[in-house]
């Protein structure tokens, strides 16, 4: 562990070690992200699912319910997979205490999301057998298993790596972080959010939509942190991001899109009015292009967002919620959130 200020300035984010020195702070942007995350606090207990339960029983078709059951099954384990990667791979290799502070907060938020989805399961699937099936979906439902296998492949890519020392190991780390930000949070979860907001556009499932607003905000911040890490590493070690690495990123997102489209084919198999496979493919390509831009790469698909209900989703509710938290707990945020800005 170094304590000399001059030597600290020479250290890079992926240098092996476990730096503990916060002053002088090398990456204040990570510390500010941590502080912003603290202000974005919310609790699952503030979500009311009563109207949702009524909607499920009286206002939804069999095709709608199939979509929801598949969505809940994906949510049952999705955030736990992200948490595992944070603990097993990211925390030990980002050698800046301010970055690890943010990861600690992100881990808390992922646990909060797990609690939200557990509460969702308890309300939407009161039958214990159905709940068990939802948690076993990563093994028993092919479209969800395909996404899980994609995730596990990238977790395994770093799991046995104790120190990042070579150029190839640094590339491995970057690809893992890009995968979990751009593919898992930025495609798998953002596609799931699109289904939620589709139901919201029909006036259905307000409890699910309210909780998703807050999860959406958290996940957007998680992605921005990961992209900032990638930009920082790229500026410190520009030689890592060569043409071969860029092609790996393109191929990775293309594979993730195909995994998510297999899930879309499953969840939309009953014929859900108002959303199609073509819509979902274009939406995923649109999201991927936004991620390429964040990574400093040329866009590949050049398509618009085909889902009008994803252009601006309930900004006033988000604003009012966080303003209430400022008054009551002094941990809220103010301002507007426009979901069409990046997604």
Named regions from a protein language model:
Residues 29, 139-142, 279, 313:
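Alpha-helix boundary/N-cap detector
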Residues 1-52, 58-60, 64, 94-101, ...:
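Extreme N-terminal leader/anchor segments
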Residues 88-161:
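Long, hydrophobic, well-ordered secondary-structure blocks that form the structural core
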Residues 89-101, 123-131, 163-176, 194-214, ...:
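Inter-helical turn/loop segments and adjacent helix faces that build the functional surface
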Residues 51-74, 134-183, 201-206:
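Acidic/His metal-coordination segments adjacent to aromatic residues that form catalytic metal sites
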Residues 52-105:
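Long, hydrophobic/aromatic-enriched structural stretches that serve as scaffold segments
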Residues 2-24, 238-343:
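Extended, helix-rich structural scaffolds rather than catalytic motifs
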Residues 75-83, 106-121, 141-148, 181-192, ...:
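Alpha-helical transition-metal enzyme core signature, strongest for iron centers
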């Amino acid at each position: 562990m170094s304590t000399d200020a001059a030597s600290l300035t020479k250290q890079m984010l992926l240098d092996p070690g476990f730096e503990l020195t916060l002053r002088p702070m090398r990456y204040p942007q990570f510390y500010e992200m941590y502080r912003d995350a603290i202000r974005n606090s919310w609790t699952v207990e503030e979500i009311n699912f009563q109207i949702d339960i009524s909607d499920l029983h009286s206002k939804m078709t069999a095709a709608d319910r199939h979509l929801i059951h598949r969505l809940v099954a994906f949510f049952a384990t999705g955030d736990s997979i992200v948490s595992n990667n944070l603990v097993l791979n990211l925390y030990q290799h980002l050698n800046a205490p301010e970055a690890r502070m943010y990861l600690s907060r992100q881990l808390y938020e992922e646990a909060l999301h797990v609690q939200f989805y557990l509460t969702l399961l308890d309300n939407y699937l009161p039958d214990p057998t159905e709940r068990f099936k939802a948690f076993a979906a990563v093994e028993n439902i092919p479209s969800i298993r395909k996404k899980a296998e994609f995730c596990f492949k990238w977790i395994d890519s770093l799991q046995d790596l104790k120190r990042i020392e070579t150029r190839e190991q640094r590339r491995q780390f970057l690809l893992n972080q890009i995968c979990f930000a751009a593919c898992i949070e930025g495609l798998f979860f953002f596609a799931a959010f699109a289904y939620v907001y589709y139901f919201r556009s029909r006036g259905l499932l307000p409890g699910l939509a309210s909780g998703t607003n807050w999860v959406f905000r958290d996940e957007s911040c998680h992605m921005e942190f990961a992209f900032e890490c990638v930009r920082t590493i790229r500026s410190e070690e520009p030689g890592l991001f060569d043409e071969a690495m860029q092609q790996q990123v393109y191929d990775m997102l293309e594979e993730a899109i195909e995994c998510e489209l297999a899930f879309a084919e499953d969840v939309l198999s009953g014929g859900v009015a108002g959303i199609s496979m073509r819509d979902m493919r274009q939406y995923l390509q649109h999201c991927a292009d936004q991620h390429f831009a964040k990574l400093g790469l040329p866009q590949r698909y050049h398509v618009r967002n085909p889902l009008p209900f994803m252009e601006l989703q309930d900004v006033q509710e988000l604003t009012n919620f966080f303003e209430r938290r400022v008054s009551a707990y002094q941990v809220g945020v103010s301002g507007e959130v426009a979901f069409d800005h990046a997604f």
